[in-house]
Curated annotation (Swiss-Prot):
Gene (name only): lepA
Listed EC numbers: 3.6.5.n1
GO cellular component entries: plasma membrane
Protein purpose: Required for accurate and efficient protein synthesis under certain stress conditions. May act as a fidelity factor of the translation reaction, by catalyzing a one-codon backward translocation of tRNAs on improperly translocated ribosomes. Back-translocation proceeds from a post-translocation (POST) complex to a pre-translocation (PRE) complex, thus giving elongation factor G a second chance to translocate the tRNAs correctly. Binds to ribosomes in a GTP-dependent manner.
One MF annotation (Gene Ontology) recorded for this entry: translation elongation factor activity
InterPro entries: EF-4, EFG_III/V, EFG_V-like, EFTu-like_2, G_TR_CS, LepA_C_sf, LepA_CTD, LepA_IV
Domain tr-type G: from-to ranges: 2-184
Protein keywords: Cell inner membrane, Cell membrane, GTP-binding, Hydrolase, Membrane, Nucleotide-binding, Protein biosynthesis
Pfam families: EFG_C (PF00679), GTP_EFTU (PF00009), GTP_EFTU_D2 (PF03144), LepA_C (PF06421)
Membrane topology listed for this record: Peripheral membrane protein
NCBIfam families to which the protein is assigned, alphabetical: lepA, small_GTP
Annotated binding of GTP, by residue: D14, H15, G16, K17, S18, T19, N131, K132, I133, D134
Protein name (Swiss-Prot/TrEMBL): Elongation factor 4
Catalytic activity of the protein: GTP + H2O = GDP + phosphate + H(+)
């Protein structure tokens, strides 16, 4: 056990986490040079293209140190995005140490700080690593100052590397062996293992990724999940070295996998504790909670005959993504589909892209919404995440919406622009303070619904790319919410209904009406497009009618002849308007829903 080191790499997005993992893998020599490729731990095409890590990956690296001993370095590669922060916290709980990776040209950013606090909470030994020292724009001295002042770490212990060029990787390996503590644990104690991730194998069922804290587990053992008391028989245990390597036993201090013929990912919850059925451990590992969806949206197939294909695709995707929540729904305008819950907007985008790419689906996705709380006059309350379920306003005493605490790190010259942006989004400024030099951290309390759409992009725009942002959930607060309906030719289109704050409703309604008026083709009669709150119309656009020139055949002569023909046309148009139906094309739905997300 003294020769094991468990660590994770935590960093802000784009600071070179996956590239550093690649170099550590190359130095350990477990992958032949001809089999090696960049971002080797990122198994999805989507991860490679976007340059982000979506799913945690684990790998056991054998390393022969300068003292002649061979060490097992267990690297747990974590996602960097705030949507997956619970996964990151479970991965960190599985380690004794962490490498805090900082880009030499960007410096300390918001998620670096957030993840550092997470590591400190779990009493991890921390090694600061300055990456990208080969860049012309690298300012190592400035970053070392930030490590001292912003993070409160000893900058003299920082290891300087260039993951891309492979500079300083040997030094980093030696530092990991020397600085990080070996795991503690008793081989004879009852089994206590933490689940920090799981994947689905078509042939073997669920593969559980675990860190064993106490005792040992081997094939044939009867294991039990402490959150739901379900029992399974272990078929195989082993470690990860890019591919799964079976072992006879997985013992205290080790990181590996367990296969036990589990058919569904929903049985294996991230953060749960595994023990033996016959010899239970005294307590579960602390910190377990259900992953709760934050953003909700409905997904419909473009053709109603493709519903069964979409159902199969979502079921398969759920096998590899336990945090995706969904139920069946239907819409008068779009037919049958699914109401889905996601961890955040990035999670929604990833699910959409995977359904379109891997399962060849053409989708319509409704405007994302958060979960609101409605309090009735009799004191009872309910949570709603679908505009269709919003009750009659006369029954409601108050509505409440979720707020977040947003931490924004920027150069101070952008303070005014960021303050304006946050105030426009109904933000409340709580504190701000200087970090190093001209860099400052601003803390705001913001409604989650206002951050959901394009806040991050707008922040990058007003700070010319220098702003970084991280958030955590706070609580629910009273808010003036209304249900905004869109009417086309007097008929409500349920798929375009949305919940909005009173102050933003008119702006949203105008925008939706304008987009629809540009996309719906003209008919032989006028089409009014209206935004309404209850019975009150708050915005309107009109698509003018196509007209046939009925007076073309009248050459000269009496004006009353022309008037008679025009009156006849007007009557026909009136009758057409009462019985005419407007078919809304798919492009119109897509235009409105896309514009809601931008």
């Amino acid at each position: 056990m003294n020769r094991i080191r468990n660590f994770s790499i935590i960093a802000h997005i784009d600071h070179g986490k996956s590239t550093l993992s690649d170099r550590l893998i190359q130095v350990s020599g477990i992958v032949a040079a001809r089999d090696f490729r960049d971002q080797i731990l990122d198994s999805m095409d989507l991860e490679r293209e976007r340059g982000i890590t979506i799913k945690s990956q684990t790998i056991c690296l054998p390393y022969k140190a300068k003292d002649g001993a061979v060490y097992s370095l267990n690297l747990i590669d974590t996602p960097g995005h705030v949507d997956f922060s619970y996964e990151v916290s479970r991965a960190i709980a599985s380690c004794e140490g962490a490498l805090i990776l900082i880009d030499a040209s960007q410096g300390v950013e918001a998620q670096t700080v957030a993840n550092l606090y997470l590591a400190v909470d779990h009493d991890l030994e921390i090694i600061p690593v300055i990456n990208k020292i080969d860049l012309i724009s690298a300012d190592v001295e400035r970053v070392m100052e930030q490590i001292e002042e912003d993070l409160g770490l000893d900058s003299s212990a920082a290891v300087k590397v260039s993951a891309k060029e492979g500079v300083g990787i040997e030094d980093l390996m030696e530092t990991i062996v020397a600085k990080l503590p070996p795991p503690k644990g008793n081989l004879e104690a009852p089994l206590q293992a933490l689940i920090f991730d799981s994947t689905y194998d078509d042939f073997r069922g669920t593969v559980i990724h675990v860190r064993v804290f106490e005792g040992k587990v081997k094939p044939g053992d009867m294991i039990m999940f402490m959150s739901n008391d379900s029992v399974y028989k272990v078929e195989e245990v082993g470690i990860f070295q890019i591919v799964r390597k079976p072992r006879k036993v997985l013992a205290a201090g080790e990181v590996g996998y367990i296969i036990a013929g589990i058919k569904s990912l929903s049985d294996t919850r991230c953060g749960d504790t595994i023990t033996l059925k016959t010899n239970r451990c005294a307590a579960a590992m602390p910190g377990f909670r259900e992953a709760k969806p934050v953003v909700f949206s409905s997904i419909f197939p473009i053709g109603s005959d493709e519903y069964e294909d979409l159902a199969t695709a979502i079921d398969k995707l759920k096998l590899n993504d336990a945090s995706l929540v969904y139920e069946k729904t239907s819409s008068l305008a779009l037919g049958f589909g699914f109401r889905c819950g996601f961890l955040g907007l990035l999670h929604l985008e990833i699910v959409q892209e995977r359904l379109e790419r891997e399962y060849d689906q053409s989708l319509i996705i409704t405007a994302p919404t958060v979960r609101y709380e409605v309090v009735y006059h009799d004191g009872t309350s309910m949570f709603i995440d679908n505009p269709e379920l919003f009750p009659d306003p006369t029954l409601i005493q108050t509505t409440r919406e979720p707020f977040i605490k947003a931490s924004i790190i920027i150069p101070d010259k952008y303070m005014g622009a960021v303050m304006t942006l946050c105030m426009e989004r109904r933000g409340i400024s709580t504190t701000y303070h200087y970090l190093t030099g001209s860099r400052m951290e601003m803390v705001f309390e913001l409604p989650l619904a206002e951050v959901m759409y394009d806040f991050y992009d707008k922040l990058k725009t007003v700070t010319q790319g220098y702003g970084s942002f991280d958030y955590e959930m706070l609580d629910y607060r009273d808010s003036r919410l209304v249900k905004l309906d869109i009417l086309v030719n007097g008929e409500r289109v349920d798929a375009l209904s949305q919940l909005a704050h009173e102050d933003k409703a008119v702006e949203r309604a105008r925008h939706a009406c304008k987009m629809l008026s540009e996309e719906i083709p003209r008919q032989m009669f006028k089409i009014p497009i209206q935004g309404a709150i209850g019975g009150k119309i708050i915005s309107r656009e009109t698509i003018s009618a196509l007209r046939k020139d009925v007076t073309a055949k009248c050459y000269g002569g009496d004006i009353s002849r022309k008037r008679k023909l025009l009156e006849k046309q007007k009557k026909g148009k009136k009758r057409m308007k009462t019985i005419g139906k407007v078919a809304i094309p798919q492009s119109a739905f897509l235009a409105v829903l896309k514009s809601d997300q931008t």
